[in-house]
Amino acid sequence: MFKKKMLAASLSVGLIAPLASPIQESRANTNIENIGDGAEVIKRTEDVSSKKWGVTQNVQFDFVKDKKYNKDALIVKMQGFINSRTSFSDVKGRGYELTKRLIWPFQYNIGLTTKDPNVSLINSITLPKTKIETTDVGQTLGYNIGGNFQSAPSIGGNGSFNYSKTISYTQKSYVSEVDKQNSKSVKWGVKANKFVTPDGKKFAHDRYLFVQSPNGPTGSAREYFAPDNQLPPLVQSGFNPSFITTLSHEKGSKLIRVNLKFSYGRNLDITYATLFPRTGIYAERKHNAFVNRNFVVRYKVNWKTHEIKVKGHN
């Protein structure tokens, strides 16, 4: 009965509802880097922020112009910030006076999609491309004249490449993996994994994760859950993504414009904690209570002029 009440109560949650606000956009000047043998990389950067979704997309577009490569290539680095939107609150309603609620990010989502027939993702050139559980993530993409791409961990450094680009981010207590990948899209999930707590290690699906007994029945919602110094950064504040993928385009194609869709966001869990004076604290959990709370931005890319335009967002 208690579980059914908690799940029903979740339907009335308004704390994670986005706040209405326009996006903010900024554009960096074009930078051209000569990489040898007449080849060059034309670099553009777009920043788009949304208070509504608590997300900043910083996307770097690096066009590879190489006469010895039979295709045009675009290296895309997706970085920025995704706010955790973690919150602590009372559960309203008669009988819930001693029940508190924690909303927190079980998973962060980062993705790129295109439906254009003249563009394909190079699946082997995706960072990261395998499951990674380490706290610190750092990998490198290397390019040599003629269309030779390589990526870590198969390479040992940057010195032997005409051009290279790196990713670096921290994911304490989380794990990164590719959820979906094909010639038209790639999606990463940075998911809750293992946590070190004062009571020992706990797995992400443990319903007592982050739950603690308050000092008394009059305690605030915040007192029912672990203090800030016991919460990993991805729960307490948010996540700074850093991911790379590469797209190819047929040289000479009359279709010089392509639509790309970038998605940054989170899936949120709800943890309920109820204090029973005689028996102590009791926890309930709703996994994926709110999924795909994503900020989606649509870009138009011109392969000929290397112009990037923001066409819209959700």
From Swiss-Prot:
Keywords: Cytolysis, Secreted, Signal, Toxin, Virulence. Its main location: secreted. Toxicity requires sequential binding and synergistic association of a class S and a class F component which form heterooligomeric complexes. LukE (class S) associates with LukD (class F). LukE can also associate with HlgB. The gene is lukE. Residues 1-28 form the signal peptide. This is Leucotoxin LukE. Belongs to the aerolysin family. One of its GO terms (cellular component) is extracellular region. Gene3D superfamilies: Leukocidin/porin MspA. GO terms for molecular function: toxin activity. Induction: Expressed at the late exponential growth. Is cotranscribed with lukD. Part of a bi-component leucotoxin that acts by forming pores in the membrane of the target cells. LukE-LukD is as effective as the Panton-Valentine leucocidin (PVL) for inducing dermonecrosis when injected in the rabbit skin, but not hemolytic and poorly leucotoxic on human blood cells compared to other leucotoxins expressed by S.aureus. Pfam families: Leukocidin. InterPro entries: Bi-component_toxin_staph (IPR003963), Leukocidin/Hemolysin_toxin (IPR016183), Leukocidin/porin_MspA_sf (IPR036435).
